[in-house]
Amino acid sequence: MTPTAVRRWDVVVRRLPLYASGAFVVLTVFLSVLATLTYRGHGPGRTGAVLNGPAWLDAWFQGDSGWYYRIADSGYFYTPGHQSPVAFFPAYPLAVRALGLVLGGDWSTAAGWVTLISALGAVALFADWARTRLPPRTAVVAVALLLLYPYSFFLYGTGYSDALFLLTTLGSFALLERRHFVLAGLVGILATGGRPTGVAVLIALVVRALEMLAEERAARAAPRVPVSVTSGRGGVREADERPERRAGPVPLRELCGAVRLVRWRQLAVLVSAAGLLGWMVYLGVRFGDPLAFVTVQGAPGWDQGSGPYTWFKALFVATVLKGMWPTLTLLAPQALACLAGVLLVPTAWRRFGWGYAAFAVVSISIPIIGTKDFMGAGRYMLVAFPLIGAAAVVLTGDRRPRWLAPAALGLAAVGLCIATVAYVSGVEVS
């Protein structure tokens, strides 16, 4: 890469959160037009009592959006053995209700705006995270992957919780990296109270806090090497000494050894568990089952009960053996996304360390183990953001052809458009 090209990439990366936010707005407009045209031509009918907002937002109100509408409007109920809203964690519907009250009880419009605002913040935070850990071109590709991932349509106005969960997850990590341990724990409450995979945030915050302690201790013990720095308006070069940087994550032994360095301020990240614990206490007190969000998954129609039938994907295997191609068209891409996620974990660990690898592992393990046929796994992979960064690393490696990343992004963009049309047409895409 020429020096001029390097400088151009550097300029882009310095403003990457701003550019990423602008790209998100442009894609929101484009996909909303596509969704509106699709909805008017092929979308299922909806009653005005539910959808009384602008058409470009109403088009995104499909699938489980109705459950969040019901929770925001009427609260929770639980009928054992039947599908019930306790399957859905409270952070997102509470946010929808809060905004909906401002909008005069228009819950569907509120749901769309909560998603859009959350997604805009999440994209900016991800861009900031990527630019501090990846080379300039790789960081740009990582942001593009987040925006164009086929299941990223859930970020562009749907009544789903993915955008808010991604925002609170990235926010808690951003605060942790700045040593705001209490604030990281408080924002983490929204994440663990946002969806079942919120437990991944709790685990990862703890691991990352330990990792930061281990890194600080290693930096103090590392030999110092001379470097030249530029200071002053005249560009005077001065000698300085900095710790020698060690490539890769800290050894596991040092990570475990950092436990004895923990102080009360680091323990504050454990506050993030309050979201999940509070939800379980509510379910236990009101419905007599603190794990109702797990129990209800086995209700007829969802049939996501735990056990070997679910763990070993018996239904998915049967679907493959019977050659049920229309169903496989929906399930196979999500199974491939899970496979790609598993394969990317080592790269995420080498590049981003133990904490982010722990988040990725737990995030993808829950849908892989907990779904009977991989349905829903595609959007669960969306929030495993370290894997998106790892995918960008793979696509832009030194041994990769320059056309590989643009080709992959182009293919992803086509998939995003197809998934959007299918979703708005009432197809259960993920």
Q: What is the predicted role of each segment?
A:
Residues 1-50, 261-271, 404, 408:
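Start-transfer (signal-anchor) and selected internal transmembrane alpha helices
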Residues 114-118, 134-137, 141-174, 183, ...:
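Multi-pass, polyprenyl lipid-linked donor-dependent membrane glycosyltransferases
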Residues 270-273, 397-428:
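Signature aromatic-anchored transmembrane alpha helix within multi-pass, membrane-resident enzymes
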Residues 59-77, 81-104, 307-316:
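Short hydrophobic/aromatic helix or loop-helix immediately within or flanking a transmembrane segment
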Residues 28-44, 60, 202-343, 355-360:
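Membrane-lumen/periplasm interface segments of specific transmembrane helices
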Residues 98-101, 113-133, 340-346:
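Transmembrane-helix motifs of polytopic, lipid-linked glycan transferases
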Residues 83-90, 94, 102-121, 155, ...:
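Loop-to-helix entry region of an early transmembrane alpha helix in multi-pass inner-membrane enzymes
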Residues 106-109, 126-148, 167, 354, ...:
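Transmembrane-helix signature of polytopic, membrane-embedded enzymes
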